[in-house]
Amino acid sequence: VEYDDDLVRGSIEESYHIAFERCEDFMPDTTVRLPDFVVPAGYDEDGYLKRLASEGLFSILKAKGLTQKRTKSKSLIHEYEQRLNHELSVIADRGFSKYFLTMKAISDKTNEVQLSGPGRGSAAGSLVAYSLGITQIDPIKYGLLFSRFLRSDATDYPDIDYDVSDPMVLKDILIDEWGDSTVVPISNWNTLQLRSL
C-alpha cells in the first residue's frame, strides 16, 4: 500500500484537532453515594438495623435450639450477642446502616422470587449479614472474622458479593418496587494498588 505524505499528515492533524480541540475534559464524579433507605417512623437507621438483626439472630438461635433455659447455651448465646453488638457498633460508626438495610431488602426480594444465590466473600464473616439473611454462613460456627469484611479503622466500603440468577429480572423488580429514578445498574472501575495502601 502506498501512502501519500500529505494524506498521513492531514490525518494526524485532524486526529489531533478532534482529540484536543473538540473534546471536553471529563473527570468522572467519584463521590460515593450510599443508598438512602427509608426506615419506619420512630426509628433511625441504626436503631432499625439493630432491631432487624436482633430479631434475625433470635430466630436463628431458636432454630438451633439455643435458649437461655439451657446452661450450656448461655455462654454461646452471650458470644453471639456480643459479636452482634460489636458489628452493629462498627457499622453505625462507619455510617453503613442504610447500606445493610438496603441489602436486606434486596435479599428478601430475591428470596421471595427465588433468584438468590449465596452471599459470598468476606461478607460471610458478618453476623449482622447472617442475621439479616444476606448470607447463609454462620460466622461464629466457622470462625470467620468480621474484621476481614469491615473494620472501624479502615477507609474502604463494605462490599457484599451477592449473586442472583438473573440480574436484569431483579433490576426490573426493584424498579417496580422503588422507582426507576432510584435503581440503576452500576459498573466497577477496577484499579490495582497495594493492599496496605
Question: Where in the sequence are the language-model features?
Answer:
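Phosphodiester-processing cores and adjacent nucleic acid-binding clamps
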Residues: V1-L197
